[in-house]
């Protein structure tokens, strides 16, 4: 084997080792474990008119589907929506 072939083989082996070592699917969890949305499963289905209906998430939660398409039934997980507060002035317009 020539030096170039050995070098190429070493590069490929290193790349495969790095790929195996550094690519893993980490489980996602809600930020607050005690929220109303944690560990709640939701589902997207279609009613008799073909409209998408989401079931299972409490108010203030967002259902994130585990599906690639938007036109299929899917299961998902509920996540808490971020809450923000706005301050208004006496004129009724939001303060900057």
Swiss-Prot record:
GO cellular component: extracellular region
Keyword field contains 4Fe-4S: no
Keyword Disulfide bond: yes
Record key words, sorted: Complement system impairing toxin, Disulfide bond, Secreted, Signal, Toxin
CDD domains: C5_RaCI-like
Subcellular location: Secreted
Tissues expressing this chain: Expressed in salivary glands.
Protein name: Complement inhibitor RaCI4
GO MF terms held by the record: toxin activity
Signal peptide positions (record): 1-24
Organism: Hyalomma rufipes
Disulfide bonds: 37-61, 42-63, 57-78
Protein task: Complement inhibitor. Prevents complement-mediated C5 activation by binding to C5. Binds C5 at a different binding site than the other tick complement inhibitors OmCI and CirpT1, and the drug eculizumab. Inhibits complement in human and guinea pig but not in other species tested (rabbit, rat, mouse, and pig).
UniProt similarity note: Belongs to the RaCI family.
């Amino acid at each position: 084997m020539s030096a170039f072939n050995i070098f190429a083989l070493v590069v490929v082996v290193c790349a495969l080792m790095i790929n195996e070592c550094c690519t893993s699917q980490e489980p996602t969890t809600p930020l607050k474990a005690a929220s109303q949305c944690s560990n709640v499963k939701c589902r997207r289905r279609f009613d008799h008119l073909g409209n998408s209906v989401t079931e299972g998430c409490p108010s203030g939660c967002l259902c994130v589907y585990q599906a690639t398409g938007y036109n299929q039934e899917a299961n998902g997980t509920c996540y808490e929506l971020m809450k923000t507060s706005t301050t208004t002035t006496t004129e009724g317009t939001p303060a900057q």
